[in-house]
A protein has these predicted regions:
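Hydrophobic transmembrane alpha-helices and their immediate loop junctions
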Residues: 1-173
């Protein structure tokens, strides 16, 4: 039960952070759409897709709700969606690294008691989930983050993938 609780908490943190990083990268690269859609927030309900969240809790491999990007307004035009994805994945990787680096700080701050064991377990689970999330989201298919690549490079392919996003998501699950 404890492992499932850790994975639930890690999924909330990783999905929320990654969704926020996607929206922030899109905004910094010139697309205001995610900001207007309310995605530039740390609200997990804005970012988590139900199927992706359940898969994330069960296997530590998941995805966030797709972000609507306009490649024409992004810096880099056609490669803009790829830049947004890479920035967000780098942010998620940094989150995992930070969680891993906080373990000794927590241990020495709490003196190795049960509180530190719980928090260290949560940090380790979040770090592992973040790494697994980044690795799975490097696969260039929608609904995964790297699937945004197709929206800029080959819009017809991206449109087809977007249309069949749910069957693809269920296949990934």
């Amino acid at each position: 039960f404890q492992r499932l609780l850790y994975q639930f908490c890690a999924a909330i943190v990783v999905l929320t952070a990654h969704g926020f990083f996607l929206a922030l990268a899109a905004r910094l690269l010139g697309d205001r759409g995610p900001q207007y859609d309310g995605r530039l927030a740390l609200n997990p309900f804005r970012h988590a897709e139900p199927v992706g969240a359940l898969v994330m809790i069960a296997t530590q491999l998941g995805w966030v709700r797709p972000l609507t990007l306009d490649p024409d307004v992004l810096v880099g035009k056609r490669i803009g969606p790829l830049l947004v994805t890479l920035c967000a994945l780098a942010g998620s990787l940094a989150l995992g690294w930070c969680c891993w680096q906080l373990r000794p700080v927590v241990f020495f701050s709490f003196g190795g008691g049960s509180g530190s064991t719980t928090l260290i377990g949560l940090l380790e689970t979040t770090a592992r989930a973040s790494l697994a999330f980044v690795l799975i989201n490097l696969i260039p298919v929608l609904p995964l983050s790297a699937g945004h690549f197709w929206l800029g490079i080959a819009p017809p392919v991206g449109a087809v993938m977007n249309r069949y996003r749910l069957p693809i998501a269920l296949g990934l699950a």
